[in-house]
Protein backbone atom coordinates (compact mmCIF):
# COMPACT_ATOMS: atom_id res chain seq x y z
CA UNK A 1 0.00 0.00 0.00
CA UNK A 2 1.21 3.50 -0.87
CA UNK A 3 0.61 6.08 1.86
CA UNK A 4 0.94 9.56 0.43
CA UNK A 5 -0.83 12.15 2.57
CA UNK A 6 0.79 13.25 5.83
CA UNK A 7 0.20 13.74 8.66
CA UNK A 8 -0.67 10.12 9.31
CA UNK A 9 0.23 7.44 11.83
CA UNK A 10 1.72 4.26 10.39
CA UNK A 11 1.42 1.76 13.18
CA UNK A 12 2.10 2.69 16.79
CA UNK A 13 5.73 3.78 16.41
CA UNK A 14 5.84 5.88 13.23
CA UNK A 15 4.33 9.15 12.04
CA UNK A 16 4.63 10.41 8.47
CA UNK A 17 4.71 14.21 8.81
CA UNK A 18 5.87 17.13 6.69
CA UNK A 19 4.45 17.31 3.17
CA UNK A 20 3.89 14.56 0.63
CA UNK A 21 6.72 15.94 -1.49
CA UNK A 22 9.09 16.22 1.48
CA UNK A 23 8.01 13.87 4.25
CA UNK A 24 9.54 13.94 7.72
CA UNK A 25 9.38 10.77 9.81
CA UNK A 26 8.88 10.81 13.57
CA UNK A 27 9.73 7.51 15.24
CA UNK A 28 8.62 7.11 18.85
CA UNK A 29 8.90 4.52 21.59
CA UNK A 30 9.27 4.41 25.36
CA UNK A 31 8.73 8.09 26.00
CA UNK A 32 11.19 9.39 23.44
CA UNK A 33 11.26 10.13 19.73
CA UNK A 34 13.57 10.89 16.82
CA UNK A 35 13.01 12.81 13.61
CA UNK A 36 14.38 11.31 10.39
CA UNK A 37 14.91 13.53 7.31
CA UNK A 38 15.72 17.23 7.25
CA UNK A 39 13.47 18.43 4.43
CA UNK A 40 13.16 21.85 2.88
CA UNK A 41 13.01 24.88 5.16
CA UNK A 42 9.20 24.99 5.07
CA UNK A 43 9.13 21.60 6.77
CA UNK A 44 10.04 23.43 9.98
CA UNK A 45 6.82 25.45 10.30
CA UNK A 46 4.79 22.57 8.85
CA UNK A 47 6.16 20.08 11.37
CA UNK A 48 5.64 22.46 14.27
CA UNK A 49 1.99 22.89 13.30
CA UNK A 50 1.50 19.14 12.89
CA UNK A 51 3.05 17.99 16.15
CA UNK A 52 1.16 20.68 18.06
CA UNK A 53 -2.10 19.44 16.56
CA UNK A 54 -1.16 15.83 17.32
CA UNK A 55 -0.17 16.61 20.90
CA UNK A 56 3.44 15.44 20.52
CA UNK A 57 5.60 17.12 23.15
CA UNK A 58 8.74 18.68 21.66
CA UNK A 59 10.85 17.47 24.59
CA UNK A 60 10.24 13.87 23.50
CA UNK A 61 12.40 14.37 20.39
CA UNK A 62 15.95 13.42 21.35
CA UNK A 63 17.61 13.09 17.90
CA UNK A 64 17.45 14.69 14.45
CA UNK A 65 18.70 12.29 11.78
CA UNK A 66 19.78 13.44 8.30
CA UNK A 67 19.76 10.85 5.51
CA UNK A 68 22.03 12.78 3.11
CA UNK A 69 23.37 16.24 2.49
CA UNK A 70 21.22 17.54 -0.37
CA UNK A 71 19.31 20.83 -0.19
CA UNK A 72 15.86 19.24 0.01
CA UNK A 73 16.99 17.07 2.94
CA UNK A 74 18.77 19.46 5.32
CA UNK A 75 17.20 22.91 5.18
CA UNK A 76 14.69 22.41 7.99
CA UNK A 77 17.37 21.20 10.40
CA UNK A 78 18.00 24.66 11.93
CA UNK A 79 14.26 24.98 12.64
CA UNK A 80 14.24 21.49 14.13
CA UNK A 81 17.11 22.47 16.45
CA UNK A 82 15.03 25.34 17.80
CA UNK A 83 11.92 23.18 18.03
CA UNK A 84 13.69 20.35 19.84
CA UNK A 85 16.24 22.00 22.18
CA UNK A 86 19.18 19.78 23.01
CA UNK A 87 18.44 17.20 20.32
CA UNK A 88 21.70 16.37 18.49
CA UNK A 89 21.89 16.31 14.70
CA UNK A 90 23.18 13.04 13.20
CA UNK A 91 24.57 12.58 9.68
CA UNK A 92 27.37 10.88 7.75
CA UNK A 93 30.86 12.39 7.68
CA UNK A 94 30.50 13.52 4.07
CA UNK A 95 27.09 15.05 4.73
CA UNK A 96 28.46 16.82 7.81
CA UNK A 97 31.23 18.39 5.72
CA UNK A 98 28.72 19.63 3.15
CA UNK A 99 26.38 20.98 5.80
CA UNK A 100 29.24 22.87 7.44
CA UNK A 101 30.32 24.49 4.16
CA UNK A 102 29.07 28.07 3.81
CA UNK A 103 29.35 28.04 0.02
CA UNK A 104 27.28 24.85 -0.21
CA UNK A 105 24.58 26.14 2.13
CA UNK A 106 24.52 29.45 0.28
CA UNK A 107 23.74 27.52 -2.90
CA UNK A 108 21.23 25.36 -1.04
CA UNK A 109 19.29 28.47 0.04
CA UNK A 110 18.69 29.33 -3.63
CA UNK A 111 17.38 25.84 -4.38
CA UNK A 112 15.30 25.96 -1.21
CA UNK A 113 13.76 29.27 -2.21
CA UNK A 114 12.68 27.85 -5.56
CA UNK A 115 11.23 24.72 -3.95
CA UNK A 116 9.38 26.80 -1.37
CA UNK A 117 7.81 28.93 -4.10
CA UNK A 118 6.77 25.75 -5.93
CA UNK A 119 5.17 24.33 -2.78
CA UNK A 120 3.25 27.56 -2.18
CA UNK A 121 2.17 27.68 -5.81
CA UNK A 122 0.73 24.18 -5.75
CA UNK A 123 -0.98 24.73 -2.39
CA UNK A 124 1.15 22.24 -0.46
CA UNK A 125 2.09 24.93 2.07
CA UNK A 126 0.79 28.38 2.90
CA UNK A 127 2.63 31.69 2.69
CA UNK A 128 2.75 31.70 6.49
CA UNK A 129 4.69 28.42 6.44
CA UNK A 130 7.59 29.90 4.50
CA UNK A 131 10.60 29.75 6.81
CA UNK A 132 12.62 32.88 7.65
CA UNK A 133 15.92 33.42 5.87
CA UNK A 134 19.00 31.67 7.22
CA UNK A 135 21.08 33.81 9.54
CA UNK A 136 24.07 31.46 9.44
CA UNK A 137 25.24 29.53 6.40
CA UNK A 138 26.26 26.44 8.33
CA UNK A 139 24.26 23.49 9.64
CA UNK A 140 26.23 21.79 12.38
CA UNK A 141 26.26 18.03 12.93
CA UNK A 142 26.77 16.69 16.46
CA UNK A 143 27.21 12.98 15.83
CA UNK A 144 28.80 11.43 12.76
CA UNK A 145 27.20 8.19 11.62
CA UNK A 146 28.78 5.35 9.68
CA UNK A 147 27.96 1.87 8.47
CA UNK A 148 27.34 -0.45 11.41
CA UNK A 149 26.30 2.23 13.89
CA UNK A 150 23.02 2.04 15.77
CA UNK A 151 20.40 4.69 16.55
CA UNK A 152 18.27 3.84 19.57
CA UNK A 153 14.84 5.34 20.07
CA UNK A 154 13.37 3.98 23.28
CA UNK A 155 13.34 0.23 22.78
CA UNK A 156 13.74 0.50 19.01
CA UNK A 157 17.16 0.04 17.44
CA UNK A 158 17.88 1.27 13.91
CA UNK A 159 20.87 -0.15 12.04
CA UNK A 160 22.80 2.46 10.06
CA UNK A 161 23.45 1.31 6.50
CA UNK A 162 25.68 3.11 4.01
CA UNK A 163 23.73 3.24 0.74
CA UNK A 164 25.79 5.21 -1.80
CA UNK A 165 24.89 5.73 -5.43
CA UNK A 166 22.47 8.64 -5.25
CA UNK A 167 25.12 10.48 -3.26
CA UNK A 168 28.30 9.41 -1.51
CA UNK A 169 26.84 10.60 1.80
CA UNK A 170 23.58 8.64 1.68
CA UNK A 171 22.55 6.58 4.70
CA UNK A 172 19.55 4.32 5.22
CA UNK A 173 18.18 2.99 8.50
CA UNK A 174 16.51 -0.31 9.38
CA UNK A 175 14.69 -1.41 12.52
CA UNK A 176 14.63 -5.24 12.28
CA UNK A 177 11.94 -5.92 14.89
CA UNK A 178 9.33 -3.54 13.49
CA UNK A 179 10.79 -4.02 9.99
CA UNK A 180 10.87 -0.29 9.28
CA UNK A 181 13.31 0.96 6.62
CA UNK A 182 14.05 4.64 6.01
CA UNK A 183 15.80 4.69 2.64
CA UNK A 184 16.32 8.28 1.45
CA UNK A 185 16.70 8.74 -2.34
CA UNK A 186 18.81 5.79 -3.43
CA UNK A 187 15.87 3.74 -4.77
CA UNK A 188 14.83 6.59 -7.08
CA UNK A 189 12.16 9.27 -7.26
CA UNK A 190 8.95 7.26 -6.99
CA UNK A 191 5.72 8.65 -8.44
CA UNK A 192 2.84 6.79 -6.75
CA UNK A 193 0.13 7.95 -9.15
CA UNK A 194 1.77 6.10 -12.04
CA UNK A 195 3.88 3.67 -10.01
CA UNK A 196 6.96 4.75 -11.94
CA UNK A 197 10.46 5.86 -10.95
CA UNK A 198 13.01 8.38 -12.06
CA UNK A 199 16.34 6.75 -11.18
CA UNK A 200 18.77 9.07 -9.39
CA UNK A 201 22.20 7.44 -9.49
CA UNK A 202 23.88 10.83 -9.44
CA UNK A 203 27.24 9.56 -8.17
CA UNK A 204 27.51 5.91 -9.26
CA UNK A 205 25.27 3.51 -11.17
CA UNK A 206 26.79 0.31 -9.80
CA UNK A 207 26.67 1.54 -6.20
CA UNK A 208 23.07 2.70 -6.56
CA UNK A 209 21.96 -0.67 -7.91
CA UNK A 210 23.88 -2.54 -5.20
CA UNK A 211 22.44 -0.30 -2.46
CA UNK A 212 18.89 -0.82 -3.72
CA UNK A 213 19.38 -4.59 -3.88
CA UNK A 214 20.79 -4.55 -0.37
CA UNK A 215 17.75 -2.69 0.93
CA UNK A 216 15.45 -5.08 -0.91
CA UNK A 217 17.03 -8.00 0.93
CA UNK A 218 16.32 -6.59 4.41
CA UNK A 219 12.80 -7.96 4.63
CA UNK A 220 11.26 -4.58 5.45
CA UNK A 221 7.50 -4.29 5.74
CA UNK A 222 7.43 -0.49 5.96
CA UNK A 223 9.60 1.58 3.62
CA UNK A 224 9.81 5.33 4.23
CA UNK A 225 10.81 7.13 1.05
CA UNK A 226 12.45 10.54 0.83
CA UNK A 227 9.63 11.79 -1.38
CA UNK A 228 5.98 11.11 -2.07
CA UNK A 229 5.15 7.91 -0.20
CA UNK A 230 5.55 5.27 2.45
CA UNK A 231 5.19 1.70 1.18
CA UNK A 232 3.57 -0.76 3.60
CA UNK A 233 2.97 -4.50 3.55
CA UNK A 234 5.55 -7.20 2.77
CA UNK A 235 4.15 -7.95 -0.69
CA UNK A 236 3.93 -4.31 -1.75
CA UNK A 237 7.42 -3.61 -0.41
CA UNK A 238 8.76 -6.54 -2.43
CA UNK A 239 7.03 -5.22 -5.56
CA UNK A 240 8.35 -1.73 -4.84
CA UNK A 241 11.95 -2.87 -4.75
CA UNK A 242 11.51 -5.07 -7.81
CA UNK A 243 10.14 -2.06 -9.66
CA UNK A 244 12.91 0.23 -8.44
CA UNK A 245 15.64 -2.19 -9.50
CA UNK A 246 14.04 -2.79 -12.89
CA UNK A 247 13.67 0.97 -13.38
CA UNK A 248 17.33 1.66 -12.62
CA UNK A 249 18.45 -1.07 -15.01
CA UNK A 250 16.04 0.02 -17.76
CA UNK A 251 17.06 3.68 -17.55
CA UNK A 252 20.70 2.70 -17.74
CA UNK A 253 20.01 0.52 -20.79
CA UNK A 254 18.08 3.31 -22.47
CA UNK A 255 21.00 5.68 -22.05
CA UNK A 256 23.61 3.19 -23.25
CA UNK A 257 21.54 2.06 -26.23
CA UNK A 258 20.84 5.65 -27.27
CA UNK A 259 24.51 6.64 -27.16
CA UNK A 260 25.60 3.49 -28.99
CA UNK A 261 23.03 4.33 -31.67
CA UNK A 262 24.68 7.72 -32.15
CA UNK A 263 22.58 9.96 -29.91
CA UNK A 264 24.45 13.07 -28.81
CA UNK A 265 24.93 13.18 -25.05
CA UNK A 266 23.79 16.78 -24.74
CA UNK A 267 20.66 16.10 -26.74
CA UNK A 268 19.93 13.01 -24.66
CA UNK A 269 20.33 14.95 -21.41
CA UNK A 270 17.93 17.55 -22.77
CA UNK A 271 15.38 14.90 -23.70
CA UNK A 272 15.57 13.03 -20.40
CA UNK A 273 15.52 16.23 -18.38
CA UNK A 274 12.44 17.47 -20.21
CA UNK A 275 10.66 14.20 -19.44
CA UNK A 276 11.10 14.37 -15.67
CA UNK A 277 10.57 18.14 -15.59
CA UNK A 278 7.17 17.62 -17.20
CA UNK A 279 6.27 15.15 -14.44
CA UNK A 280 7.33 17.19 -11.43
CA UNK A 281 8.26 20.76 -12.39
CA UNK A 282 9.62 21.48 -8.93
CA UNK A 283 12.70 23.24 -10.29
CA UNK A 284 13.66 24.79 -13.65
CA UNK A 285 14.20 22.58 -16.69
CA UNK A 286 17.97 23.06 -16.75
CA UNK A 287 18.24 21.64 -13.21
CA UNK A 288 16.82 18.32 -14.38
CA UNK A 289 18.85 18.36 -17.59
CA UNK A 290 22.06 18.80 -15.60
CA UNK A 291 21.11 15.95 -13.30
CA UNK A 292 20.31 13.77 -16.30
CA UNK A 293 23.76 14.56 -17.65
CA UNK A 294 25.13 12.99 -14.46
CA UNK A 295 23.06 9.87 -15.07
CA UNK A 296 24.41 9.67 -18.61
CA UNK A 297 27.99 10.11 -17.41
CA UNK A 298 27.61 7.40 -14.79
CA UNK A 299 25.94 4.94 -17.15
CA UNK A 300 28.61 5.41 -19.79
CA UNK A 301 31.40 5.18 -17.23
CA UNK A 302 29.95 1.86 -16.06
CA UNK A 303 30.10 0.59 -19.65
CA UNK A 304 33.57 2.01 -20.30
CA UNK A 305 32.25 4.31 -23.02
CA UNK A 306 33.99 7.65 -23.44
CA UNK A 307 32.09 10.49 -25.09
CA UNK A 308 32.08 14.26 -24.90
CA UNK A 309 30.74 15.38 -21.53
CA UNK A 310 27.03 16.28 -21.85
CA UNK A 311 26.22 19.83 -20.81
Model-found features: residue ranges?
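Conserved beta-strand hairpin/beta-sheet module of binuclear metal-dependent hydrolase folds
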Residues: 3-54, 172-185
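Core dinuclear metal-dependent hydrolase active-site scaffold
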Residues: 26-27, 144-175, 180
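Active-site neighborhood of phospho(di)ester-bond hydrolases with catalytic His/Asp-centered motifs
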Residues: 36-39, 60-68, 90-92, 162-165, ...
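Active-site environment of divalent metal-dependent phosphoester hydrolases
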Residues: 41-43, 69-74, 96-98, 167-170, ...
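Active-site HxH/HxHxD metal-binding segment of metal-dependent hydrolases
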Residues: 52-150, 250
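Divalent-metal (often Zn2+) His-rich catalytic cores of metallo-beta-lactamase-fold enzymes
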Residues: 83, 174, 180, 203-261
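Surface-exposed cleft-lining segments at the edges of enzyme active sites
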Residues: 192-202
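C-terminal regulatory/interaction regions
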Residues: 254-311
Amino acid sequence: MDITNPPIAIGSHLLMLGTSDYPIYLVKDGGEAAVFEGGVSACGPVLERQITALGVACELVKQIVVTHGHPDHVMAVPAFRKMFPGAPVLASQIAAATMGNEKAIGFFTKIDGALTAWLVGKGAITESEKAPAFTELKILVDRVLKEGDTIRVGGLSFDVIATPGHSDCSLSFFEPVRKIAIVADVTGFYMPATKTWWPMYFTDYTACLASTRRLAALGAEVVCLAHNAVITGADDVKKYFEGAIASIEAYHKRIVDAVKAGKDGRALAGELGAEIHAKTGSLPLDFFQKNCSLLIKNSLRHEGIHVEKPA
